[in-house]
């Protein structure tokens, strides 16, 4: 039944089937296949200020340096042979520039695979952290994972002063609780959202590489893409979280244990580093037995098409 619950969490269509015949349905197998295609020209985002150079006949003019600030999108117009560098353009400058990557000057949009070993390590770290929480901190975090997330996030997005005394206390306890959790290694998490919600968090900048994302509320994310997809309205945020104090892995104490939730700090500022279109196909095989009849094996297929928006925490 745990696996059936997993399908319920991943697919609304399967959820109805599993719920209707819960006592007679067994999951035999589930497989998912995902691929993604990049949108637009190759682009990078600077994580610190860099020096580029004006060009003459697509060759660098080292007599004319151009300073480019951090958190700027670089659109690649040409990659030079032999990894010699790139011909790029930047917002607000129509001229082509020469840039040579220095390894640590750009955000990396590469994700980190959350394998079973890494999830186990994170779970152990979370359990150790949770034992140090006060009763009020634990209660507030659990309340958030249940019925409290809307009221708490509304308070954070609006005015905490207008929120009830209980909600203000919950916010204080959640903050003090999750700020104690230290992520010991970089992590990639996922969040399902809508295009409307994404644009709102981008403050109407437009969905583009270099767009700056911010939400004063906590962001519930998950280690599992398919869990995020079940909450998505055609948009998945893929967030690369560096080591440090950026939130907490709360799954072991969550009321929705199994969703693999990493709760990000409210007000976390991020920047779009990659845009893709994602395609996922889910194959499920279940066995159903109705009263007085033979067991029937059913094969189900569901396809998803969605945007993948890769975000990195801003420097």
Please place each PLM-identified region on the residue numbering.
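Generic detector of short, well-ordered, non-transmembrane alpha-helical segments enriched
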Residues: 9-11, 67, 186, 268
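A generic structural signal for short, solvent-exposed coil/turn residues
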Residues: 7, 37-38, 44, 60, ...
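A short macromolecule-binding patch
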Residues: 92-104
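Structured surface patches comprising rigid loops and adjacent beta-strands/short helices at the edges
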Residues: 50, 101-109
């Amino acid at each position: 039944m745990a696996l059936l619950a997993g399908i319920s969490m991943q697919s609304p269509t399967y959820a109805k089937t599993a719920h209707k015949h819960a006592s007679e349905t067994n999951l035999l197998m589930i497989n998912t296949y995902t691929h993604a295609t990049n949108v637009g020209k190759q682009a990078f985002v600077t994580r610190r200020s860099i020096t580029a150079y004006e060009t003459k006949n697509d060759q660098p003019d080292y007599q004319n340096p151009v300073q480019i600030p951090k958190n700027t999108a670089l659109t690649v117009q040409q990659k030079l042979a032999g990894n010699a560098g790139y011909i790029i353009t930047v917002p607000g400058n129509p001229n082509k520039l020469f840039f040579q990557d220095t390894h640590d000057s750009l955000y990396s949009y590469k994700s980190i695979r959350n394998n079973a070993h890494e999830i186990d390590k994170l779970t152990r770290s979370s359990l150790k952290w949770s034992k140090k929480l006060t009763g009020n901190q634990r209660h507030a975090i659990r309340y958030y994972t249940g019925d409290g997330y809307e009221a708490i996030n509304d308070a954070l997005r609006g005015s905490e002063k207008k929120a009830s005394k209980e909600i203000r206390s919950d916010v204080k306890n959640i903050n003090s609780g999750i700020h104690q959790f230290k992520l010991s290694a970089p992590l990639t998490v996922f969040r399902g959202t809508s295009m409307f919600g994404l644009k709102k968090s981008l403050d109407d900048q437009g969905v583009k590489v270099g767009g700056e994302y911010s939400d004063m509320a906590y962001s519930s994310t998950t280690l599992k893409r398919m869990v995020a997809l079940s909450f998505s309205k055609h948009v998945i945020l893929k967030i690369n979280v560096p080591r440090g104090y950026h939130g907490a892995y709360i799954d072991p104490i969550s009321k929705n244990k199994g969703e693999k939730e990493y709760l990000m700090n409210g007000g976390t500022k991020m920047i779009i580093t990659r845009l893709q279109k994602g395609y996922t196909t889910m194959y499920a095989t279940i066995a159903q037995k109705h009263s007085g009849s033979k067991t029937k094996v059913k094969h189900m297929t569901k396809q998803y098409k969605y945007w993948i928006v890769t975000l990195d925490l801003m420097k």
